[in-house]
RNA sequence: GCCCCGGUCGUCUAGCCCGGUCAAGGAUAUCGGCCUCUCGAGCCGAAGAUCCCGGGUUCAAAUCCCGGCCGGGGCACCA
């Protein structure tokens, strides 16, 4: 045994010394020894002493003899390969207990379309339920506020579309405004068991009780009284604001907002009708109540949501406790700030109202529809979300990162086209007989996609203004000498290797007679840049939605005739 | 102010739960080279991290414990 350890120590001491300029470190060698011979941990102190001796010996040797001894005894120790890591999120706690039947949900308020911020919970919840576990993914519309965050009738469908595009199809769908009776029933049970009560104090009075950490006088009334009040709430005898149903928690809870939080309130739906149910209901559950009840009723096992919901989890646990239900596992992830993109719902909405943004898919915005219009692929959003993962700390991700992921997917798909941006130069061609024919490569990585033929008779082309050399290569057409300050191009040959050898700039061009005018729209912070120019004739045939690369310019998505939206470099 | 939660290359992240194969791996951005009919892609290389700071436990701490600092979230009859 002793001998074995000494040998192992010698091996790692040598390897360590060779790796770090002749001096091995005791700590590192000890670690390696334990890794190779885990049993040795039991006699850790002795091993350390032994390693110290060995390291001393090794360090007194010359680097050359260390290396030669190592390669003689353990040649394999010289190759330092590393483990490869697989990109995958950590498993979910509590997934075993449910036998891998993980049920998650995505629960948006249908008051707006989805944006990059909402993509995170959508993808994460979908990923765990459907990709990592063999479970169920639920879509639930949380539209229980007809007053402050009024649902937008179109939003239900817009969100469904957004999710389908994102690649997170759902197994079941629920709309909270259609489930009011469910919430009423649980409310009644809680009142009867003395765990909820109707309070008729004003908002200010309730706040005062909370701040003081004192119980609400209403809470001392018997359940029968509260049942009566509850009936009166439902029958419309209390005007808006006159009564609320509160959940008993702890009047002195360290977090004042948890103290007997409000589960239902009266809303005047004649004044502010709900887009789906009109004025049918006047008593509305709050987010925390509806959410708690639904998560249980729908069998949700895991809730993944942002850290802004941390206190809500705390509140909702009281409903579970009172009802004797088992709460789902909650995981809170941190904020994801996307630098250089407008994400906030309220800012977007205000911007659209003020005319700052044209619409919900204005290319400067971070809505999923805007990203799609810009040519961002859902796969790229997935990569971004999965990379950021479920860490609780705030992540400041850059648009560059999103673009890098997107480029990975877009690059092979996007065929190459030529587009000459303004200011373009017109040059006449000498030395080629009309009709002139060029063959441009459709995609350099995929020769099987072939070449595109451009034929024209009038010997004039548009050139990008950055052509300043005495010779230039026009892609697919030939090498030229630049004469008369760039107004003339004299044909030399069509040999790519000539261009390489003489280091000619290789540029895009467009025939003047059949070029297609176009403009590229580019989101630049709060502005939209417009780059107009001339494209090769086949641009006219590209269908809207097609994503291509404008050579030497960047990737674009075809918006419509003559309009292209810049995706990224 | 009160209540939570965090802190690893510029940025994002792996490792942390269960201390040792980590003098810290990957990605992105940057810089160089090769390759390419693009300023795209690919390949190779460089540089980049006092693992927030201080203390403690231990043979051994990015990992466990305590304190500090800094950052974030919440404090609605919104979701």
Curated annotation (Swiss-Prot):
UniProt family annotation: Belongs to the class-I aminoacyl-tRNA synthetase family. Glutamate--tRNA ligase type 2 subfamily.
Top-rank lineage group of the source organism: Archaea
InterPro entries: Gln/Glu-tRNA_Ligase, Glu-tRNA-synth_arc/euk, Glu/Gln-tRNA-synth, Glu/Gln-tRNA-synth_Ib_cat-dom, Glu/Gln-tRNA-synth_Ib_codon-bd, Rbsml_bL25/Gln-tRNA_synth_N, Ribosomal_bL25/Gln-tRNA_synth, Rossmann-like_a/b/a_fold
Name the record gives this protein: Glutamate--tRNA ligase
Compartments where found: Cytoplasm
Protein's organism: Thermofilum pendens (strain DSM 2475 / Hrk 5)
Pfam families cross-referenced by the UniProt entry: tRNA-synt_1c (PF00749), tRNA-synt_1c_C (PF03950), tRNA-synt_1c_C2 (PF20974)
Cellular compartments per GO CC: cytosol
Molecular function via GO: ATP binding; glutamate-tRNA ligase activity
Motif 'HIGH' region: chain residues: 108-118
Reactions accelerated catalytically: tRNA(Glu) + L-glutamate + ATP = L-glutamyl-tRNA(Glu) + AMP + diphosphate
UniProt-listed GO biological process terms: amide biosynthetic process; glutamyl-tRNA aminoacylation
EC number: 6.1.1.17
Keywords from the UniProt entry: Aminoacyl-tRNA synthetase, ATP-binding, Cytoplasm, Ligase, Nucleotide-binding, Protein biosynthesis
Biological function: Catalyzes the attachment of glutamate to tRNA(Glu) in a two-step reaction: glutamate is first activated by ATP to form Glu-AMP and then transferred to the acceptor end of tRNA(Glu).
């Amino acid at each position: 045994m002793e001998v074995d350890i000494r040998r192992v120590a010698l091996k790692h001491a040598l390897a360590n010394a060779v790796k770090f300029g002749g001096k091995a470190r005791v700590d590192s060698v000890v670690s390696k020894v334990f890794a190779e011979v885990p049993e040795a941990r039991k006699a850790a102190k002795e091993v350390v002493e032994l390693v110290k001796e060995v390291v001393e010996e090794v360090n007194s040797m010359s680097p050359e003899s260390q290396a030669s001894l190592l390669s003689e005894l353990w040649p394999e120790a010289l190759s330092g390969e590393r483990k490869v890591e697989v990109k995958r999120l950590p498993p979910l706690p509590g997934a075993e207990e449910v036998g891998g039947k993980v049920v998650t949900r995505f629960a948006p308020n249908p008051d707006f379309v989805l944006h990059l911020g909402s993509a995170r919970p959508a993808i994460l919840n979908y990923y765990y339920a459907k990709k990592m576990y063999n479970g169920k993914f639920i879509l639930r519309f949380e539209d229980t506020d007809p007053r402050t965050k009024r649902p937008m009738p179109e939003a239900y469908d817009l969100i469904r579309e957004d999710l389908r595009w994102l690649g997170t199809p759902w197994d079941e769908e629920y709309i909270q405004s259609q489930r009011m009776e469910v919430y009423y029933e649980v409310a009644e049970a809680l009142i009867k068991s003395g765990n909820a009560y109707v309070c008729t104090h004003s908002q200010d009075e309730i706040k005062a009780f909370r701040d003081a950490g004192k119980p609400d006088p209403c809470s001392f009334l018997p359940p029968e009284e509260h049942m009566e009040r509850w009936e009166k709430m439902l029958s419309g005898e209390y005007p808006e604001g006159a009564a609320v149903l509160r959940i008993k928690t702890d009047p002195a809870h360290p977090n004042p907002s948890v103290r007997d939080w409000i589960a239902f309130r009266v809303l005047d739906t004649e004044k502010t009708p709900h887009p789906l149910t009109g004025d049918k209901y006047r008593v509305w559950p709050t987010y925390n109540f509806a959410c708690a009840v639904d998560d249980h009723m729908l069998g949700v096992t895991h809730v993944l949501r942002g850290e802004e919901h941390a206190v809500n989890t705390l509140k909702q646990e009281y409903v579970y406790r009172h009802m004797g239900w088992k709460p789902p596992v909650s995981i809170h992830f941190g904020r994801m700030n996307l630098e250089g993109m407008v994400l906030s719902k309220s800012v977007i909405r205000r911007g659209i109202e003020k005319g700052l943004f044209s619409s919900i898919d204005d290319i400067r915005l971070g809505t999923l529809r805007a990203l799609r219009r810009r040519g961002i692929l859902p796969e790229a959003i997935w990569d971004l979300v999965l990379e950021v993962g479920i860490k609780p700390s705030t992540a400041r991700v850059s648009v560059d990162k999103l673009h890098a992921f997107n480029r990975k997917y877009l690059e092979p798909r996007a065929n190459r086209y030529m587009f000459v941006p303004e200011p373009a130069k017109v040059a006449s061609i000498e030395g080629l007989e009309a009709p002139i024919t060029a063959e441009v490569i459709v995609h350099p990585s995929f020769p099987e996609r072939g070449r595109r033929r451009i034929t024209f008779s009038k010997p004039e082309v548009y050139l990008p203004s950055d052509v300043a050399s005495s010779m230039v290569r026009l892609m697919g057409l030939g090498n030229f000498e630049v004469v008369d300050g760039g107004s003339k191009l004299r044909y030399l040959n069509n040999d790519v290797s000539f261009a390489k050898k003489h280091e000619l700039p290789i540029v895009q061009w467009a025939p003047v007679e059949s070029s297609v005018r176009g403009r590229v729209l580019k989101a630049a912070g709060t502005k939209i840049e417009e780059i107009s120019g001339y494209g090769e004739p086949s641009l006219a045939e590209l269908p809207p939605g097609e994503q291509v690369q404008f050579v030497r310019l960047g990737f674009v998505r075809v918006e419509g005739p003559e309009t292209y939206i810049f995706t990224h470099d």
